[in-house]
């Protein structure tokens, strides 16, 4: 699956996708990314598309650390995806890791809207978390 960075001409589509998720989070909205950008964060809006519509997405925030020590990478209240669709989740997470690594992220924090369970813990460990 191909993961693309979403440009501003798809802002409404991004917000509609985020708003219709079972666990909508303001922190995955376009405006939240704009706010964080003003606070010195670099914003990447990454999405998996199928048949010209977003099926999984993550607003990845990157903040440089002082002294050129790398950066931190953070996806507040996301990624947003159907975690049972393993191929989709794997593709999105691979691109997230690639972008974070490109910014020399010393860690990547995600906050997927999942209930804490041994099944979800096992799944996330299997995906590299």
Enumerate the language-model features and the residues they cover:
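Short amphipathic alpha-helix that is part of the acyltransferase structural core
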Residues: 1-30
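Flexible, glycine-rich phosphate/dinucleotide-binding loops
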Residues: 12, 67, 117
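Generic secondary-structure boundary/loop-capping signal
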Residues: 23-24, 32, 77, 126
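Conserved donor-binding loop and adjoining core beta-sheet/short helix segment
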Residues: 33-113
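Internal, well-ordered alpha/beta segment that forms a basic, Gly-enriched binding/recognition surface
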Residues: 108-129
């Amino acid at each position: 699956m191909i993961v693309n960075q979403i440009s501003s001409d798809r802002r409404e589509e991004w917000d509609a996708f985020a708003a219709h998720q079972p666990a909508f989070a303001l922190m995955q909205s376009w405006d939240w990314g704009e706010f964080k950008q003003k606070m010195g964060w670099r914003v990447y809006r990454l999405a998996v598309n199928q048949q010209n519509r977003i099926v999984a997405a993550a607003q990845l925030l990157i903040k440089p650390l002082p002294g050129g020590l790398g950066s931190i990478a953070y996806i507040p209240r996301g990624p947003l995806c159907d975690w049972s669709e393993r191929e989709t989740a794997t593709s999105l997470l691979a691109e997230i890791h690639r972008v974070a690594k490109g910014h020399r992220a010393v860690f990547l924090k995600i906050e997927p809207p999942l209930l804490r369970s041994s099944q979800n813990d096992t799944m996330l460990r299997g995906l590299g978390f």
